[in-house]
Amino acid sequence: MLGRRKRPPVLAQVPAPAGDSPRLGALGRAELDACRGLATALAGTRSVLATGPARSAVALGLATAATAEGRRVALLECDLASPALAPLLGLSATPGLSEYLRGEAEAPQILQSLVLAGPAAGRATEPLACIVAGAPEPEPAALLDSDRCIHATGKLRRAYDLLVIDGPPTGPGTGPLRALADQVDATIVCGERGTIAKRLPVQVTGLVLFG
């Protein structure tokens, strides 16, 4: 348990973007600079799981910053119970990861591209590859711990320079979080100071303070 280990280091402090949602267009220079610093702190890491209250904003910021540096990046939404990224990014909500894991869609059908523009584009040479969660799945743990999910995350890790997973929350029902933590190189917990859970059932690489 995290409570029995030394508290993980703070890897970055990311200011909250304008507005209430982690929209790509709301990421300003300060947010992108902070996320570049996070990418530097995670240098050598090929796959990152973001959890905590600010997980979506930090996952999107990290994926954007790494793409803007010219890296090939995939952003995978794994909060199957409460999907949120598709409307924020202007992407199709289905089919997504849940349909793929149930065998209702194949990989080419769920992969979407997000072209960076404006300050976020940086030195990007390719679009940000995105896979959204798909239709809500009330019991996601079994799907995320399935051979099909393990195969998918492994394939994404090999195909891209960085895989960023916008993961499930840290609240009750930690099965989905445990399943995904075993499939990545690093797990980061993201949130405002005082809101980050002190005890988690997974090894935590570091904290990202948000706001």
Give the location of each predicted region.
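Motif I (Walker A/P-loop) of helicase-class P-loop NTPases
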Residues: S56-A63
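Conserved catalytic-core segment of NTP-binding enzymes
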Residues: P119, A142-G211
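P-loop/Walker-type NTP enzyme "switch/lid" segment
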Residues: V10-S56, A74-R158, P169-G171
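Domain-scale detector for complete catalytic domains at protein termini or as standalone homologs
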Residues: M1-L2, G52
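Gly/Ala-rich phosphate-binding loop of Rossmann-like dinucleotide-binding domains
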Residues: A63, T67, L101, R157, ...
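Beta-strand-loop-alpha "switch" segments that mediate conformational coupling across diverse proteins
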Residues: L2-S21, G134, P201-G211
